[in-house]
Amino acid sequence: MAIYLALGDSISIDDYTGVPGGGAASQLARKLGLDLVDLTRDGNTTQGVLADLARAPTSADVVTLTAGGNDLLGGESPRAILRRLDQITHRLQPLGGHTVVNTVYDPSDGDNAIGRRELGLSRLATVELRRRLNALNGGIAKLARERGLLLADLERLCHGHGLASDEPWFVQVIEPNLAAATAIAEHWHELLTS
């Protein structure tokens, strides 16, 4: 059977959806009828994904990579995060499958007041975090173009469903709920099948 390798952080996991198998990776595996090798975990960073690659299969038909947000929240520079994402995607090339890389979403929908309140940041720190988020997402899009990877712009996909919206897609500030996971899985499916 064909293999789907999921790498990364809580964007992909089932835990916050309230439904067994509700995470984006689980939903995509079912939609595509692929065997899921799930190496995602809550709080994972790009450094963690590099380590996880040692457990990856030698081939995969589909790979999704959701990483960078926890690095960003941990104070890492976009340049350092992008360097590790470049290393990861380079190491994924021999697997031979279609790889989907993802931008980092913004649960505040661009509202710095929400970022300050929910993350306990000063105004200056919030502005700096947004600058770093924009730089990271721009770098992820560039990496996808340069490597010929599929790009899922999760920042755009999730915009309008932030914490203050009538239909928020997040719990515990940054974690995707079932609606978010479903939208992400559908977006990945569309990218992979169009």
Regions found by a protein language model. Name each.
Residues 48-83, 106-109:
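Oxyanion-hole/transition-state-stabilizing segment in secreted/luminal serine hydrolases
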Residues 3, 61-64, 98:
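Structural motif
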Residues 78, 82-86, 137, 178-189:
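Short, amphipathic alpha-helical "lid/cap" segments that border enzyme active or binding sites
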Residues 94-99, 149:
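A short helix->loop->beta-strand "cap" motif at the edges of active sites that frequently abuts
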Residues 38-40, 103, 153-156:
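Residue-level recognition of beta-strand->loop/alpha-helix junctions
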Residues 1-42, 52-59:
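Serine-esterase "nucleophile elbow" of acetyl-processing enzymes
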Residues 36-38, 49, 150, 166-194:
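Histidine-centered active-site loop/cap adjacent to the catalytic His
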Residues 111-152:
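Substrate-gating cap/lid alpha-helix
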